[in-house]
Amino acid sequence: MGGLFHKLRHPRRCYVVCTIPRSGSNLLTDGLRATHRAGMPKQFFLPKFETRYGVELALDPLADYPGYVRGIANTKTTGNEVFGFKLMSWYLDTFLTRLRDTCAFGDAATDDLSLLRNAFPRLRFVHIHRRHKLRQALSTARALQTGLWKVKNGEMEEREPQFDAELIEQSLREAERQEGIWQNFFQRIGVRPFEVEYEKLCHDYEETIRSVLDFLRISLPRGARVGPPVTIRQSDEISRTWEERFLAERPSAYSPATG
């Protein structure tokens, strides 16, 4: 009965971090998770990760996708009944289709926002992006070569990345395309997400994390502080050298005024 009273007093609240690669989403979600009050936001619905989470929780996303969705939301919450997850734009449409095809959260006539909120009660949207799109593209090109997408203290790249202007420009255009997917989605569903700028997150980590918590209406215990970042920035002398060289070799490919 105590569990029932707890759920009545603290109804489930959900949020999704909407992002694209190299936007700083790991820095953000690691910080939210470390508060122990904002769920455990991960890419639970990226198909290649679902098998792992399914095994962990004895869920079968292939046989019972509604059961998997509900099981994740029921188990990956913090004690205050907050559930968070992360979505990349490149599998957004696939995820929506899978939710709709189950007929458990809506049908062909159900709009996307209702579909999502049927699956995730009181869902709110957080969008993290980078203002400096060229540096984002540099980071993507580097990660594609090294395979290191998330860096923690003490970790090193296993192989030296090489400057590749074509790969950098392709990464820049792809980032623009993927950000466009999110902007079209927010416009379509009529939602204005809470915007987090990666550069501001790096400059004032604790204040930015707290601003997201305020948006989500999550309070921390009195006197609690947001800990230092778990994930570290990958920008270094290589990144600075690449940026200067790219701008020199392809001056028309990027305008700082727009990125």
Show the residue positions of the predicted features.
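PAPS-dependent sulfotransferase catalytic core
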Residues: 1-88, 230-236, 242
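Membrane-proximal basic amphipathic "stem/tether" segments
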Residues: 1-16, 100-101, 107-108, 240-259
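Aromatic-acidic/polar surface patches that form glycan- and anion
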Residues: 10, 20-21, 77, 171-175, ...
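Flexible, glycine-rich phosphate/dinucleotide-binding loops
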Residues: 24, 47, 91, 134, ...
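Short, structurally constrained coil/turn elements
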Residues: 34, 78, 119, 187-189
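The conserved 3'-phosphoadenosine-5'-phosphosulfate
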Residues: 45-52, 152-160, 166-168, 185-257
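PAPS-dependent sulfotransferase catalytic domain
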Residues: 84-187, 206-221
